[in-house]
Amino acid sequence: MAGGPVITEDDRCGHFALPIEGLLINGTQEWEGAVNQKQHKHLSAMCRCGKVKFEAVGPPILTGSCYCTSCQEAGRQLEQLASAPPVLDPDSGTSLILYRKDRVQCVMGQQYLEEHRLKPDSPTRRVIAQCCNSAMFLDFTKGHWLSMFRNRFPTGAPPLEMRVMTKERRVGVELADDLPNYSGHSGKFMLKLIAAWIAMGFRRPESTLGKTVHRV
């Protein structure tokens, strides 16, 4: 596979395969931040009932809201689970905070995590805390990042930087001009993902959180 990031039909919510063949960059070193993680800010994400807790270390890759049809469909279906808290924002967007996979860990309640996929063979999985059906994160399994649901951070969540895939937003939604609104994905979005991958030494750590595969 050559060239830039590839988007498949099921991956329109910004979860890309980033082929190393297309990045001819020499002298890449492992990210040094892991040595001094105590110097970085920790943010905690929790399920609604408090049984599941995640910690994210350091600054996120980016924070944005996605309006793709896949995120909207998954959000609607996850919200239909018993007593589930909201996933979608009122304007049909899904607010996400993207972190490197090696900077997010579940520190409490891992046994409650359960993954859901729109299709059995989808590379994108959404992991909920089944204790209260709170959506915790989205994992594009071929990527190097996790997309944490922003509404699961009770405090300290960084503000949104952009809106993406706005061409697929719900009919009738008028977006404010307080943020950059991109009909697809922006160059800034892509560059930040690639920069994070370079800093990771082109590694793609696997997230094993959530065991059972379900179709939502």
Language model features by range: what are they?
Residues L24:
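Small, basic N-terminal interaction modules of short regulatory proteins
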Residues I7-E9:
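Intrinsic low-complexity, disordered N-terminal segments enriched in polar/charged/small residues
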Residues G27, W31-M46, V52-V216:
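A short Gly-Trp-Pro
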